Amino acid sequence: MIALRKPAVAIILIGIFLFQETTAQPAWKIAGEKISTNWAAMVDHKHPLPEYPRPQMQRNNWINLNGLWDYAIKPVAEKTPTVYDGKILVPYAVESALSGVAREVGKGNCLWYKTKFTAPKNSKDKRLLLHFGAVDWQSTIYINGNELNTHKGGYDPFYVDITDHLKKGQQELVVR
């Protein structure tokens, strides 16, 4: 009888493990039902808004950084976070259900974003620019721990040249 118990216990434990794996929380889901439209269900968190933002000026050598980023809402006085609150779907606003967060930043706080990417291989005479379609009011851009630029202005596009701050392998981009 004891010989049968051990395999039964093992099978039960394996079953519990498999059940936990299949019920794990997804990396992203729509947060709530705020202002839901028919198109919200069509959002693909692996490829959100994949099209080139300015079709008349499309280039062959560009990459889209939209997707799941780390985010943190922290007091304005705090430095770059070491721990983030979760994942946010860029380019959607943190307050939006489509961001997967649906939280307000609140007075006295700021929002931090972080992602990693691999830079395309450039020739010596080319520069690598990060184009931002819009950032609400004020942003500071960091590449690999280096503060590069602070931009002020509501929802106007800007770019940052990151060429001189690239390293081998993955790049870390942080936006405050």
Please tell me what each predicted stretch does.
Residues 25-62:
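N-terminal pre-domain segments of enzymes
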Residues 1-27:
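Bacterial Sec-dependent N-terminal signal peptides
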